[in-house]
Every structure is written in structure tokens, then in C-alpha cells.
Curated annotation (Swiss-Prot):
Function: FAD-linked oxidoreductase; part of the gene cluster that mediates the biosynthesis of azaphilones, a class of fungal metabolites characterized by a highly oxygenated pyrano-quinone bicyclic core and exhibiting a broad range of bioactivities. In the first step, the non-reducing polyketide synthase azaA forms the hexaketide precursor from successive condensations of five malonyl-CoA units, presumably with a simple acetyl-CoA starter unit.
Family: Belongs to the oxygen-dependent FAD-linked oxidoreductase family.
Matches recorded under SUPFAM superfamilies: FAD-binding/transporter-associated domain-like (SSF56176)
GO MF annotations, alphabetized: FAD binding; oxidoreductase activity
Induction text: Expression is under the control of the azaphilone cluster-specific transcription factor azaR.
Name of the featured protein: FAD-linked oxidoreductase azaL
Signal peptide positions (record): 1-18
Domain of life: Eukaryota
Annotated ranges, domain FAD-binding PCMH-type: 54-228
EC top class named in words: oxidoreductase
Organism from which the protein derives: Aspergillus niger (strain ATCC 1015 / CBS 113.46 / FGSC A1144 / LSHB Ac4 / NCTC 3858a / NRRL 328 / USDA 3528.7)
């Protein structure tokens, strides 16, 4: 779920003719032998080209190009601009913002060939290609006795998550993913290649850490990595609760508002069971430490009337698959119609959570074609908040978010009535949570943004003037 105001508008003032372009004739002579051009009419187009996680308000393409070299990307960017063809670069394909719908008749630059992983354990660094996903780095890092903060969906692109902040269950120990970023190689909108770090193009390095999708295509990135916590082992606990326990669960979540141990993360998943016609609530806890320590933080959950539980020690590569009783596959299914919304909270208001839980049940009962999941990510914000707010362009107050809310709304794509009902419901719910969020203004993890919040919310009023200056 990644925000961009970039590569669909790189000086492209006239887009109406893009659909008539023959992209093969325009680009083929400038590409290396390993590069490929794909058209939507190709038989295997959806297998050969990275597909989006969601089709909701998606961009439209007249074709895709899969570059093999950095020079290929430079040539694609230059030729696309000169021919007034909009484009987007994709890696994991998890961008879900509605702003992408404004990219029409463009080309997809599928950078999936940029998938290398190189670990320098002695110097605690890792260099990756721009298309590498979380699932590509976790096994080799684990084998090397190292770790890096990652998100919980294994198929999400590492770099894409990074430049929007990057949250996950190692955040309490090492901060946001972008706080571990050391440098990148970047193809600029003008087609130049730059090395960007604190010592080279430092202003640009500030900008890409929080607003990177606006400043170019990252072909490689180098990260600081860390010694594996608890020898790479974590406790994973899952609890399935009936609807009647939801208020008690939110009370426990509230008890962690002041202090959440850095080794502990909590995730709640709420959804409607079509069979029982009741809401259900799953809580997952990940603790990077000894089992007995982790269990000591979960006694209040264990005291509730869970209908199913499991608790196990898992190696880091198996953490995500252990969450929510192993139901992590949906996050990696492409081509679904998912209308996502999000919000960040500083505190937990039990009444707001309980009211929404009941309203989501009523909405689900009233709309049989609707299937919504409400996710609450709880990570310690201490390490992220310890980084000075002005050191990166990441939204000014985002580092103080205690709870990241994600609303995943799934329903048939041809139901405009339900589209309107869902959007109206989400606006109301977002406003309710915002009023009791503990923040004076809306705060949101950029990669969870819906796309209607506006630039002040995405980048913060404090950072937006400098970002605009660097963009001009």
C-alpha cells in the first residue's frame, strides 16, 4: 500500500495520445537483450508481468516493460517522458492508494529482475535489488544470524515498504525499516543515476525516506542489519475470541498504551463469519525472547474465553506464517477487489473500538456480498520515536503512532451501490476513530493511506514545503 505522486506525472502534460503509442517500436531499440516488452493481449500477460494486489481504482496500462539493466530503466524513463507516456514502476505490487487511478494508458515498469540479495555479515550490511520482497531476505539473513525489521506480509516489496516508513514486529527493537536504510541507487525523473545517502545527495536521501516514490526509481538499496534477537527464535501466540469478548480484548490493548515491551507486538484481526452470522476476533502476539517471558505479558488474554488458542516457538522465517493461525495467504493473493482505508492512533478508546466492532457486524449482515477485515497493528513506538522527527521526511507525528488501523474491504467489483455504501461507512468510521485518536490532527502510516487524506496528512505540514522545493 504505497503512496506516489511521482511517475504518472513526470512532466507529462498531454496523456491523451498515449493509448495510440506502439510501445514496441518506441522502446525496443533502446533496450538490452535481456529486457522484455509485454502487451495486455499477450496470452501469458498476467503470469509474465507483476500483478497488483488489489484492482480497486487501479492504473491502466497499454503495456509493460521488464528492464534487465539500470541503463534500460534510464532509457525507458527518458523515452516515456519525451513521448508523453505516463508510467509506474512496480516491484511487489502492493500499492493500494486510490491516487493510482489517475494513471491511465501508461506503461508498467516491472523491475522484478532486480532481485539480488547480498549480505555482508562482518560489516552488518545488506544490499538488495529494488524488487526484492520480504520473503527473499528473511531466510538468508536468518542463516547469517542477522535480522532486519520487515512487515508481516511476506510478498510485499522491501524497498516500497521502506520509503513509506516500514512497520513490523521488529520495530520495537530497531525502529522503522527506513531507519535502517543506508543508501540507494536511484534513477531520477530525468533519467540520471544517483547514489543517495547521508554523504551523497543528502537532501534527496532525506526526501526518499518517507516520500521516496516521488523522486525516482530505486534500483538497489543498502541496509544496516542486526544480530538476530534470541538466536532468531520468537514466541507466537494466537487466540480466537467470540464477539462477546471484543470489549475485553480492547481493554487489554488499552493496557499497553503506556508501555509495550520492544520485543512484543500485537495484531488483532476482526471479521464477520458468514456461517455463524457473528463477528470473530483473532489476536496474535509475537515476542522475540524466551517463551516464559512472552507468556507473562499475555495472562489477561489467556484469562478470557477464547474458543481456540495455540502457542509455539518459531524460527524467524516462520513468524509470519504462524500468525492468525496460519491465515497469512490472503495478503499475497493478487487481483482481488480490495478497498483499503487506514488511520494511526496514539491511544486506545475502548468505546470507539467496541462501537465500530458492532457496526461492522451490522454492516456485514446488511450486505451479504461484503467481506471486511479490520486489522490493528500494535508495535512499540519507542525506537522509532527516538529518531529525530526532522532527520527524514517521514510524516512528523507518525513515529508516535501506537496503533496502526487497516480496514480491508472486499466485495464484487461490479457493485457500485456497495462501493458507495462502503466508502460512506469508512469515512464515518475513520472520523469516529480520529476524534478519539489522541492526535489533534489525522496521522497515518503512509502505506496504509486510502488516498483521499491529502498531502498534509501523507507528508505532514512540517515536511511538505521542503519536499515541494526538492521536487521542483
Amino acid at each position: 500500500m504505497f503512496r506516489t505522486i511521482l511517475l504518472c506525472s513526470l512532466g507529462l502534460t498531454t496523456l491523451s495520445s498515449a493509448a495510440t503509442h506502439n510501445i514496441t517500436s518506441i522502446f525496443s531499440s533502446s533496450l538490452s537483450p535481456g529486457a522484455q516488452i509485454f502487451l495486455p493481449s499477450d496470452t501469458n500477460y498476467t503470469e509474465d508481468v507483476t500483478q497488483r494486489w488489489t484492482t480497486y481504482d487501479a492504473p491502466t496500462y497499454i503495456g509493460a516493460i521488464k528492464p534487465a539493466t539500470v541503463k534500460d530503466i534510464q532509457n525507458i524513463v527518458t523515452l516515456a517522458a519525451s513521448n508523453k507516456i505516463p508510467f509506474l514502476a512496480t516491484a511487489g505490487g502492493h500499492g493500494a492508494t486510490i491516487t493510482y487511478v489517475n494513471c491511465t494508458n501508461g506503461i508498467e515498469i516491472d523491475i522484478s529482475n532486480f532481485n539480488t540479495v547480498s549480505i555482508d555479515a562482518s560489516n552488518n550490511t545488506m544490499t538488495v535489488g529494488g524488487a526484492v520482497r520480504f520473503e527473499d531476505i528473511i531466510p538468508p539473513l536468518y542463516e547469517a544470524g542477522k535480522e532486519l525489521p520487515t512487515g508481516t506480509a511476506p510478498c510485499v516489496g522491501l524497498v516500497g515498504a521502506t520509503i513509506g516508513g516500514g512497520i513490523g514486529n521488529l520495530q520495537g527493537l530497531h525502529g522503522l525499516i527506513l531507519d535502517s536504510l543506508l543508501s540507494v541507487e536511484l534513477v531520477t525523473p530525468s533519467g540520471d543515476v544517483l547514489t543517495v545517502s547521508t554523504s551523497e545527495n543528502a537532501d534527496l536521501f532525506w526526501a526518499i525516506r518517507g516520500a521516496g516514490a516521488n523522486f525516482g526509481i530505486i534500483t538497489s538499496a543498502t541496509y544496516k542489519i542486526y544480530n538476530a534477537t534470541n538466536n532468531g527464535l520468537a514466541m507466537s501466540a494466537n487466540y480466537l475470541f467470540p464477539a462477546s469478548e471484543n470489549r475485553s480484548v480492547w481493554e487489554i490493548f488499552q493496557s499497553f498504551d503506556e508501555t509495550l515491551p520492544p520485543e512484543l507486538s500485537l495484531t488483532a484481526y476482526s471479521g464477520f463469519n458468514q456461517t455463524t452470522q457473528e463477528m470473530e476476533l483473532i489476536v496474535n502476539a509475537i515476542y522475540y525472547g524466551p517463551k516464559e517471558e512472552g507468556v507473562s505479558y499475555l495472562t489477561n488474554f489467556a484469562a478470557l474465553n477464547a474458543t481456540e488458542t495455540n502457542l509455539m516457538m518459531v524460527a524467524w522465517p516462520n513468524v509470519t506464517s504462524s500468525m492468525a493461525f496460519g491465515a497469512d495467504g490472503d495478503a499475497c493473493t493478487t487481483g482481488s477487489y480490495l478497498n483499503t482505508w487506514g488511520l494511526g492512533l496514539a491511544e486506545t478508546n475502548i468505546d470507539t473500538y467496541t462501537t465500530f466492532f458492532n457496526e461492522l457486524q451490522a454492516f456485514s449482515q446488511a450486505h451479504p456480498d461484503y467481506s471486511g477485515i479490520f486489522v490493528v497493528d500494535r508495535y512499540s513506538s519507542a525506537a522509532a520515536a527516538a529518531v529525530p522527527a526532522n532527520s527524514t521526511s517521514y510524516g512528523y507525528g507518525y513515529r508516535n503512532i501506537n496503533s496502526h488501523l487497516l480496514f480491508e474491504n472486499s466485495y464484487p467489483s461490479d457493485n457500485s451501490t456497495l462501493d458507495n455504501a462502503v466508502n460512506s461507512f469508512m469515512r464515518s468510521i475513520r472520523s469516529q476513530f480520529q476524534r478519539t485518536s489522541g492526535f489533534s490532527e489525522m496521522e497515518i502510516y503512509l502505506n496504509y493511506a486510502h488516498g483521499d487524506e491529502g498531502a498534509d496528512v501523507w507528508y505532514s505540514p512540517q515536511h511538505l514545503p521542503k519536499l515541494s522545493q526538492l521536487k521542483s
